[in-house]
Amino acid sequence: MLTNPLAMKRPDWRDIAEQKMPKELRLAYELTALTDFRDARLEIQKNLRRSNQPFADALLAELYNSSGDSLLMTRSLRRAYPQLATVEQDTVPAYFLKMYYPIRYFDAIMKYSKQNGLDPYLMMGLIHQESFYNPLVRSPVGATGLMQLMPPTAKEIARRIHSSSNVEDPEVNIRLGTNYFRQLVNLFGGAVPLAIASYNAGQGNVLRWRRAAPHRPMDEFLESIPFPETRNYVKRVTMLSASYRRITR
């Protein structure tokens, strides 16, 4: 059975940078290792300005990750390693790449991607964008879970494939979400970029836009999408997919 290639092991921090850890951060490092998150955070914040900034932000990222705060973890990592937003991600220590690109339901993603004939790395990128692997996240309009499924959509797919519709269950959500994405791919004749766009903007909108420009090359069509959020969404999911493909091999 395939195992999660992003399983994380805490490194000896002396091995992830050329210079040694500043002495004012060593206590924070030890406190984080002991899961004393409150005191560790206070130590880091107290010494942040006078310490090595990337080290401090990286320690904060580990602290927030350990305490389940993915938003602050992401912000801290981006400060520590600005190259996370570029194509130079290979220069980021593997431990932090694994933190930035989590996969918490690897086996389910592989299983249901294969069942639906989908690229699992694309599904990893989509889940990252939709929920950052938080199975309980809910949008203001009611989209729920890892793949942010709307209740009517989830119920319709669940009825058709004889599945539970409990979208807060990670495996159920992935099963329903990958099935729904397969539907979108089929609807657009195998055009995955259009399926990604419709996952964000709705299939009705994308069908209407494509019918208005049926022969426009795909790259030009994607740039002409009238919703800025959807244009950026397609680019973001595509980039995340490529990142997951690269770091899991």
Regions from the PLM with identified roles:
Residues M1-E18, L27, D39-R249:
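Catalytic glycan-binding domains that act on GlcNAc-containing polysaccharides
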Residues M21:
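Primarily a LysM-type cell-wall glycan-binding module
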Residues I16, A33-L34:
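Short Lys/Arg-enriched alpha/beta "domain-start" segment
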Residues E30:
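Active-site-adjacent segment of 2-oxoglutarate/Fe(II) JmjC oxygenases
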